[in-house]
C-alpha cells in the first residue's frame, strides 16, 4: 500500500493491517514521501485512532531501521522510558530510577531524548550531570555490561526519524510517533516500565509490547496524569508477564508509602531536576526519594531481580539509603567522557 492509498483509507476510518502499515511507515522512514503526505497521514490516523496492529507494525519498522546496541545477554535488561507529555513538569523520575536499578544489579538500556513537553527531558538532566550523550553504540554496550547502565540518545539511534521531524513539529499535535519512541529500544530490552500520557493507552500498549515479544512489562498511567507510578494517587497498570496481560491499580499506601505532594517535586529546568535527584541519592527522605523508590522498585521487579513489586521497592529503598545509586551516576559520567 502506498501513502496516497493509506491517506484515503484512514480518512475513511479504515484500519490498516500489519502489512499495509509496514509499507506506509517504511516509505515514511526511508524518505519516499513528502511532508504534506506525512502530515495528512498522521492526522488522519490520529483522528481514526491507531490500532494495536498499526502501532505494532510501525514499531517493527523503526526497530529494523535503528542503530542497535548489541549485548552478550539480555538477562535482567530493562528500560524505563515513557512517552512524556503529562504536562506536570516533575523532575526526571524514570531517569533517576535507572541508576537505582543499575545499583540493584540490573542492566538498564535507558532510551531517551531531550525535552518535548516537560521542562527537562532525560537527555537534558544527564547532560546537566556532565554525562556525554554522544557516545558510540560499542561504548554504550560496554557501559551496560560493566556499569549496569547505558543511555541511548534517541536521535543518534533513530536517524530515519529525520524524515518525520518537520511534519511533526508543524502539526504540533500528538501522533503515533509519541508512543513509538519507548517501543523502539535500540538494545531490544525485553523488560520495561513504560509510562503513557493517557489512561486509554495502558492496555493497548501492553498488547503492542506482547506483539513485539517483550518478556515482562508494566505500562502505567496515574490518576493525576503522570506517565509514571504516582506517589500522590492511584496508578493504572497493565502488566505483561508470562505472555499474559493483567490490569489493576496500585496506590502508594499499598506499599506503606505516604502520599506525597507533587508540587514539591516540580522542576523548572534540568538543573533543578538534577538537584532533586542528587538529594534523593544522598539519602534525604521526602517525596522525591519515595517516588524514585516506587518507580525503581517496579523496574527492579520487571527486570527479574526480585519476585514482587514489594521486594523491588524494598531493594530500591536500601540503595537510596546506602548511596550506591550516586556511585552509578558518577561511574557512568566518568565512562561516558572517557
Predicted regions and their residues:
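Active-site-proximal loop->helix
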Residues: 114-131
Amino acid at each position: 500500500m502506498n501513502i496516497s492509498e493509506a491517506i484515503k483509507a484512514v480518512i475513511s476510518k479504515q484500519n490498516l493491517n500489519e502489512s499495509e502499515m509496514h509499507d506506509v511507515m517504511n516509505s515514511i522512514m526511508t524518505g519516499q514521501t513528502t511532508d504534506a503526505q506525512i502530515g495528512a497521514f498522521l492526522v488522519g490516523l490520529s483522528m481514526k485512532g491507531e490500532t494495536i496492529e498499526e502501532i505494532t507494525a510501525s514499531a517493527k519498522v523503526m526497530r529494523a531501521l535503528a542503530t542497535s546496541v548489541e549485548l552478550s545477554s539480555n538477562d535482567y535488561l530493562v528500560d524505563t522510558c515513557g512517552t512524556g507529555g503529562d504536562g506536570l513538569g516533575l523532575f526526571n523520575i524514570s531517569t533517576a530510577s535507572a541508576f537505582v536499578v543499575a545499583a540493584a544489579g540490573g542492566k538498564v538500556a535507558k532510551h531517551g531524548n531531550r525535552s518535548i513537553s516537560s521542562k527537562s527531558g532525560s537527555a537534558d538532566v544527564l547532560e546537566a550531570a556532565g554525562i556525554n550523550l554522544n557516545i558510540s553504540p560499542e561504548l554504550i554496550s560496554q557501559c551496560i555490561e560493566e556499569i549496569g547502565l547505558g543511555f541511548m540518545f534517541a536521535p543518534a539511534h533513530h536517524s530515519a526519524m529525520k524524515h518525520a521531524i518537520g511534519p511533526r513539529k508543524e502539526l504540533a499535535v500528538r501522533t503515533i510517533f509519541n508512543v513509538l519512541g519507548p517501543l523502539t529500544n535500540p538494545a531490544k530490552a525485553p523488560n520495561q516500565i513504560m509510562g503513557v500520557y493517557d489512561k486509554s493507552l495502558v492496555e493497548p500498549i501492553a498488547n503492542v509490547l506482547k506483539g513485539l515479544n517483550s518478556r515482562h512489562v508494566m505500562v502505567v498511567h496515574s490518576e493525576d496524569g503522570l506517565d509514571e507510578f504516582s506517589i500522590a494517587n492511584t496508578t493504572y497498570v497493565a502488566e505483561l508477564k508470562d505472555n499474559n496481560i493483567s490490569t489493576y491499580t496500585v496506590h502508594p499506601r499499598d506499599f506503606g508509602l505516604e502520599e506525597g505532594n507533587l508540587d514539591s517535586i516540580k522542576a523548572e529546568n534540568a538543573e533543578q531536576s538534577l538537584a532533586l535527584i542528587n538529594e534523593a541519592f544522598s539519602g534525604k527522605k521526602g517525596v522525591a526519594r519515595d517516588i524514585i523508590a516506587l518507580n525503581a522498585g517496579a523496574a527492579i521487579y520487571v527486570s527479574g531481580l526480585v519476585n514482587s513489586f514489594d521486594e523491588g521497592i524494598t531493594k530500591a529503598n536500601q540503595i537510596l539509603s546506602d548511596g550506591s545509586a550516586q556511585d552509578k551516576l558518577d561511574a557512568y559520567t566518568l565512562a561516558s567522557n572517557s
